[in-house]
Amino acid sequence: MTDPLVRLEQITVAFDDRPVVDRVNLTVSRGDIVTIIGPNGAGKTTLIKTVLGIQRATSGQLSVAPGLVIGYVPQHLTLEPTLPLSVRRFMLLSGRTLADCTAALERTGVAHLLDASVHHLSGGEKQRLLLARALARKPDLLVLDEPAQGVDINGQATLYDLIRQLRDELHCGIIMISHDLHLVMAATDRVICLNQHVCCSGYPEDISQDPAFVETFGHQVAESLAVYHHHHNHRHNLHGDVVSSADAHEGCSHDHH
């Protein structure tokens, strides 16, 4: 197994002595697509901020690979509507060369919009622009916060497929937050169900049947997700380590009521 890009060990983030993220373990290596799901207020964004180094952990240990380059795609692109801003200018503000910016736009399929106004882009085009800006950094790790936000249903599957292709081409690791549970199950290698703590973690089709997942999201959601099937020759425990099938799930000791 390759050395991890990022490893979180027993990470806790508390505000006013109340844990928002509680003893979370997470390991991401090159080639991994790890999707974090959970209800609103589950601590997903706080966990991502910790990975990015924006939020300091109250306890636990965060380890990153030497020289790690992270490309971050935020959930929203909020700009002053009266500020004239072209795609070209927006990309160059990242500090990358025009050649790197253009190459990144080509990878995400929006190079033809180089001279367009950012304000006139559709939701899907904005997400591809944000993804291109992250790619221009030539990242080892991509962190995507709700990448399908504002994208119509017809474009969501295409966007997730692009993310998979980028993983294969760049051999980078990917951490993704998503509420689009149906598409997540078809687009990821490993799912972490977060509700302050890790409720369950592992192979997507197993997660949909895990009692902790069912309790968090309900039987109807779990049953609808079970139609997705992936075929892997390994499984992971809650720490992200490869284990035998019999040891794949450690369960959840937290009270979900």
From Swiss-Prot:
Keyword annotations from UniProtKB, A to Z: ATP-binding, Cell inner membrane, Cell membrane, Ion transport, Membrane, Nucleotide-binding, Translocase, Transport, Zinc, Zinc transport
Major localisation: membrane
Reaction equations catalysed: Zn(2+)(out) + ATP(in) + H2O(in) = Zn(2+)(in) + ADP(in) + phosphate(in) + H(+)(in)
Documented EC number(s): 7.2.2.20
PROSITE patterns in the record: ABC_TRANSPORTER_1 (PS00211), ABC_TRANSPORTER_2 (PS50893), ZNUC (PS51298)
Pfam families: ABC_tran
Record: residues binding ATP: 38-45
NCBIfam families the record matches: PRK09544.1 (NF007090)
PANTHER family, sorted: METAL TRANSPORT SYSTEM ATP-BINDING PROTEIN TM_0124-RELATED, ZINC IMPORT ATP-BINDING PROTEIN ZNUC
Function: Part of the ABC transporter complex ZnuABC involved in zinc import. Responsible for energy coupling to the transport system.
Family: Belongs to the ABC transporter superfamily. Zinc importer (TC 3.A.1.15.5) family.
Protein name stated in the entry: Zinc import ATP-binding protein ZnuC
Source organism of the structure: Marinobacter nauticus (strain ATCC 700491 / DSM 11845 / VT8) (Marinobacter aquaeolei)
